Amino acid sequence: TNGAVIHTQSRHATETNAPGTVRASGRIPSPGSWIGLKAHIKGLTTSANLEMHRGPIGYLGITQVEDGWHNACGLFRIDRSIKAKQADLLPAYLRKNGNHLLADQLQIADLRDDSFSAVAGFSLGNQPSTPGMMCLGDSHAIIPPFTGNGMTMAFESAEIALPHLIAYAADQFT
C-alpha cells in the first residue's frame, strides 16, 4: 500500500539507502565551536523590550516573555577554560564575554527551574550529508544568527517540499 511510516519522539536508526527516506529530525550532533545557552529569568533590569549584549566571544539577547519573566538566549564560542556547570554557565560565559554587570544581575536573579538549556556540538551552515538520504531543516543546514525569520523560513521550506513528498509517497513520480 502507499503511505509512510512516521517515527516521532525517537532517534530511530534510518536506512540511508531506502527509497523515499527523508531526514527532518534536526541537527546531527557534530564537533563544533559554538554553545547556545537559554534561560527564563525574573529580576532583571532592562531598558528595552529587546536587548542585545555582545562581546568578543558571542552575544546574549534578552526579551520580555510574561509575568515579569525574561527570555535570555545567547550564542558563544566554546571556551574550555570555563568550568561552570548547568545554569552557572550563562553568567560565566557573560563574564568571559566582558558583560560583567549583566553576569552580576543574572547571579542574583530568579531562574525558572526547568527553563535552562545548553546546546553544544553544532556548526553553522551546511551539515554533514548522508549519502542516499534527503535532509530537510536543521539536518540539512543551520542558518546563522541574525538571518531573521528563521522559523518562517523553516515553515515555508516545508510547505514547498510537502507536495513533492506526498506525490512521491503516492508513487506519482520516482
Place the predicted regions along the sequence by residue.
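FAD/FMN-dependent oxidoreductases across multiple families
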Residues: 82-161
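Feature captures the FAD/FMN-dependent oxidoreductase FAD-binding
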Residues: 1-26
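Conserved FAD-binding catalytic core of PHBH/FMO-like flavoproteins
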Residues: 20-99
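Short, well-ordered turn and helix-capping elements at secondary-structure junctions
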Residues: 10-12, 26, 56, 76, ...
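Buried hydrophobic packing segments
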Residues: 72, 158-161, 165
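Active-site-proximal substrate-binding core of FAD-dependent oxidoreductases
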Residues: 163-174
